[in-house]
Amino acid sequence: MTKPIVFSGAQPSGELTIGNYMGALRQWVNMQDDYHCIYCIVDQHAITVRQDAQKLRKATLDTLALYLACGIDPEKSTIFVQSHVPEHAQLGWALNCYTYFGELSRMTQFKDKSARYAENINAGLFDYPVLMAADILLYQTNLVPVGEDQKQHLELSRDIAQRFNALYGDIFKVPEPFIPKSGARVMSLLEPTKKMSKSDDNRNNVIGLLEDPKSVVKKIKRAVTDSDEPPVVRYDVQNKAGVSNLLDILSAVTGQSIPELEKQFEGKMYGHLKGEVADAVSGMLTELQERYHRFRNDEAFLQQVMKDGAEKASAHASRTLKAVYEAIGFVAKP
């Protein structure tokens, strides 16, 4: 029986955070045995915001080494760089012609990013969701792990696939969202009502996977809790967002349940909780960074992973693009 196909990716812009790891990368690792996993470093999406060329090249290799350090296995999964598989951009252009301006105008992420990068509101930023649809549909993807911020884009991918299929027959699989049974939603350390984001300008809000564990300890000890007297370590996202975030992080790192942790910290000060979180996270990062540096220092291996991954991805992508071009009426290349 063929395994269902899963597609996901991350941009090589900004350092990946513990939020990316606990909410996404760790789920990707766990899916490798039960699904045919295709994991992409989406460098073409990254250039919708201005990038320094040298930094982008470095960030791409850094991200690949992090994928591997987190446990993504090139023997089990297809791992590749988006720009190495030209079918992504080719299908993206074709799908533009089956996507309506009004649909893209309603994308909330475009509104957010165009407000943030007002000096560079480019067509690529507006068109980003169509390239994302191409990324997904190229591989006849069954399932896409998505967070809240990408649900709208996946819905558009489904709409485009259904519209194209209505015109030309069943060319595309219509992808479904994959909602993992467990996966921590890690919030900002100083503003715990918003998600931790690798693009946050205030770096005290964020814990990067490659940060010095000593600086991580300091950040966690400065994390927002609340002013309850006496302090109560209780999971209550509405009324105790900072404490709940620390409990979520500790639970994700140690595997202990929230009720177990509440019992463990009953009658204790917030400083005790922060100390435990700091020790657990810094220990996890120390081990992960050791694996990361081993991969990052072996550039020949990284080049081989990218080459093999692009070849595997292209074999699949070219079949879909050929079917699309035939359906549209393009003359086949002699």
From Swiss-Prot:
This is Tryptophan--tRNA ligase. Its main location: cytoplasm. A motif ('KMSKS' region) lies at residues 195-199. A motif ('HIGH' region) lies at residues 12-20. It is found in: Cytoplasm. GO terms for molecular function: ATP binding; tryptophan-tRNA ligase activity. Catalyzes the attachment of tryptophan to tRNA(Trp). GO terms for biological process: tryptophanyl-tRNA aminoacylation. Its EC number is 6.1.1.2. Pfam families: tRNA-synt_1b (PF00579). The keyword Protein biosynthesis applies. L-tryptophan binds at D135. Keywords: Aminoacyl-tRNA synthetase, ATP-binding, Cytoplasm, Ligase, Nucleotide-binding, Protein biosynthesis.
